[in-house]
Each structure stands twice: as C-alpha cells, then as structure tokens.
C-alpha cells in the first residue's frame, strides 16, 4: 500500500536511472557445463560498472539470469533500471512467470532472488537481438564468452 510519505519521497527525490546490458554463455553439452555471466551498467550514458564471472556447472539460461541478477544487485535501492538482454527466456521467467514458485519450476531459486531484489527497484526489460551490432550487447557477449573459455581451460586435465 502506497502511503502519503511514499508519494512525497517518490516525487521529491530524483531517482537514479541505469541501463544494464547483460549476457550469459554456456556449453550445455559439455560434461562440466562451463559458463560465464557478464553485465555492464550505464548511468546517464556513462559506464559505471563492468563485471563478469565464470560459472561452473550451469546452463545458458542460468548464466543469463545470473548476469541480470548481478546487474540489478549492483544498482542502488529505489533506482530505475532498464535491463537490455538477448534472453527471451530470462525476460519471460522474471517478468511473466506469475505462478507460485515451487521446486518443480526451473530456476526457481534465481527467480526468487530476482523478485527480492526487483521489489526494491523499478526494473523493466528491453529485448535486444544478439549478435546484431548493438555495441554494449557485443561487449557483454565477449565478456561472458571470455569467462566461459577461461572456465573451460581451467577444467582441462
């Protein structure tokens, strides 16, 4: 329930706005299912954060979702966040999946974590076509793939 105090705070404080570009990468057919996740954050068109991480034993969808969760977590509470992603699955899982989460819902742990973070922020999604020349999407794609390749190399015997 929105209170008068909430309305006053929302109208008198300029919210910070962020554009977050995210990507995940994984070889779902590999025995180790190595992957990588990456995000890049812009505030007023200026890059303020860029991170990536290697993910062992993951899936492509989980890597995409982890990248989004990491970007949302970076942004301050009460900020307005636009997530730019090429993952239709992640958008569907985070934005559309309204049913009660149970253990049989794939990636329910990540959906729950996203919901907890997003409840404190104003998050929206923009789908971008992957590998189509979007500058920032190409950057995070390269970052996620680099982490995937590093993980793959580190697991070689």
PLM features: residue spans?
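RNase H catalytic domain
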Residues: 19-31, 69-143, 147-148, 152-154
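RNase H-like nuclease fold core
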Residues: 2-62, 66, 73-75, 142, ...
């Amino acid at each position: 329930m929105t209170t008068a105090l909430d309305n006053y705070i929302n109208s008198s404080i300029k919210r910070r706005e962020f554009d977050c570009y995210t990507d995940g990468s994984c070889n779902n057919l590999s025995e180790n299912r190595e992957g990588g996740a990456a995000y890049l954050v812009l505030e007023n068109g200026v890059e303020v954060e860029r991170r990536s991480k290697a993910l062992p034993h993951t899936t492509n969808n989980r890597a995409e979702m982890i990248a989004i969760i990491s970007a949302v977590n970076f942004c301050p509470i009460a900020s307005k966040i636009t997530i730019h992603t090429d993952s239709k699955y992640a958008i569907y899982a985070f934005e559309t999946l309204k049913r009660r989460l149970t253990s049989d819902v794939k990636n329910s742990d990540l959906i729950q974590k996203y919901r907890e973070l997003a409840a404190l922020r104003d998050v929206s999604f923009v789908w971008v076509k992957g590998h189509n020349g979007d500058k920032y999407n190409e950057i995070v794609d390269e970052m996620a793939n680099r982490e995937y390749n590093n993980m793959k190399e580190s697991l070689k015997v």
